[in-house]
Structures are given as structure tokens and as C-alpha cells.
């Protein structure tokens, strides 16, 4: 039913701007051109879907030994954790250009780097968690308003 509603709404909207408010992020993932995230009534940020999904990646770095986060974490790495020989994090400023070099310079013994695009729901969860963790400096650099 919701899918039919969305299809009909888009068909009738034409060139109009339509504002959709939903906690079901999966429903708007392929429809929205711009998104704004609210958390507990606060605007975290707004951005075009293209820019947002281009800069967020879930990264897994496989190393030749037990993985450890670098001593000085880049501010654009969130949810950093290590399990065995894999270091995992979310990169909020992903760019193909220098990504591999940056990771290799910060994490020793890199064997493989896997960076996957993230769904809108995962991006929101990551940003909401960062904002709630109280790191106002990091949140401000990410464009999250506290």
C-alpha cells in the first residue's frame, strides 16, 4: 500500500517539491533528492542524497595481524572498532582519490580495504549515535548541529 501511495504521489507531483516526513527511511531511499535528519526535534543536517551517499562508506580493513585503531583517529571516521584482524569504521568524507593511501598510512599491515556504500538508514543511525555520544566538535565538523 505504501509503495502504491509513493508511486502515485510521485506521478502527480510532476515538478513540484514534495516534503515527506517518515521514520521509514528505506521507503524514501530511492525517491528523495534531498534529506534532512531530525533527532529528538533537532535538525542534525540537510544535504542532497547524491552528496550524502557519495561521501559515506562502511569500511573494513583487513590486516596481516590483530587490527588496532590508529592512535590519532581522523575526525571523519566514526564507529571505529576492531575484531580480530579487521578494523571497521564509517568514513564520512570518502573519496576514491586518496582513500587507500590515507588508510594504509594510518593502519599498519593492510592486506585489503573494502569500502561499501551505505543505505540511508545506516547513515542516519551512525550520525545520530555520534551526536548522542556528545562529541560536539566532531558533530560540528560532520555538519551535525547540536
Predicted region positions:
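ABC transporter nucleotide-binding domain
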Residues: 3-94
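Short, charged/small-residue-rich alpha-helical element at the C-terminal edge
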Residues: 57-135, 140-142
